[in-house]
C-alpha cells in the first residue's frame, strides 16, 4: 500500500517532538543552575536580589552567580562558597557575586563590593592550587590567591 508524503511527515514530526521532549526532561536537572554557596549565618536584615525578585536570606539559602546581597543597617551575613571560602558581610553592605567557577582543581571568584564591608577568607583550590579571588570596588581591585582580608568602600 502506498502512503502519501503528508502521512510520513506527520509521523516524523510527532516522533521528533517526542524525542525533543524526552531530551528536555532528561537533561533539565543538568541544565539547572547550581548554587555557588549558601548562607551559614544571618542576623538582622539581609536580602538577596535575584532575577528581579527579592528574597530574604536565611541560613541554608543558596547564593547563585549574579545574585546581589544587601544587608541593612543591622544586617550581617556569612556565605560559604563551594570551595569553602567565606564571605562575611557587615552592616549596610551591598555585593554582587559576579563569578564563581571550579574547573580542573582551580577556583575563580569575582565579587563586586558596591558599598559597606566585606571580609574574605579565601581557601586554596583543591590539590593546593591557588585560588583566583578578586574583589572589585568602584575605584580599585584586590586580587589574592588564598588569604584573609577585609575590604571596605563608602561613597
Question: Where in the sequence are the language-model features?
Answer:
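Bacterial N-terminal signal peptides
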Residues: 13-26
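N-terminal secretory signal peptides that target proteins for export/translocation
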Residues: 1-11
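C-terminal region of N-terminal signal peptides and the immediate post-cleavage residues
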Residues: 27-31
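Flexible, surface-exposed loop/linker segments and immediately adjacent secondary-structure boundaries
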Residues: 32-155
Amino acid at each position: 500500500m502506498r502512503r502519501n508524503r503528508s502521512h510520513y511527515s506527520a509521523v516524523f514530526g510527532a516522533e521528533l517532538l517526542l524525542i525533543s521532549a524526552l531530551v528536555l526532561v532528561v537533561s533539565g536537572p543538568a541544565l539547572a543552575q547550581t548554587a555557588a554557596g549558601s548562607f551559614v549565618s544571618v542576623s538582622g536584615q539581609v536580602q538577596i536580589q535575584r532575577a528581579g525578585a527579592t528574597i530574604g536570606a536565611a541560613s541554608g539559602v543558596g547564593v547563585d552567580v549574579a545574585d546581589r546581597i544587601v544587608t541593612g543597617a543591622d544586617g550581617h551575613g556569612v556565605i560559604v562558597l563551594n570551595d569553602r571560602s567565606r564571605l562575611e558581610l557587615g552592616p549596610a553592605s551591598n555585593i554582587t557575586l559576579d563569578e564563581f567557577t571550579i574547573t580542573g582543581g582551580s577556583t575563580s571568584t569575582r565579587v563586586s563590593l558596591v558599598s559597606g564591608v566585606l571580609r574574605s577568607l579565601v581557601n586554596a583550590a583543591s590539590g593546593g592550587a591557588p585560588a583566583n579571588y578578586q574583589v572589585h570596588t568602584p575605584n580599585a581591585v584586590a586580587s589574592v590567591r588564598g588569604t584573609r582580608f577585609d575590604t571596605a568602600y563608602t561613597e
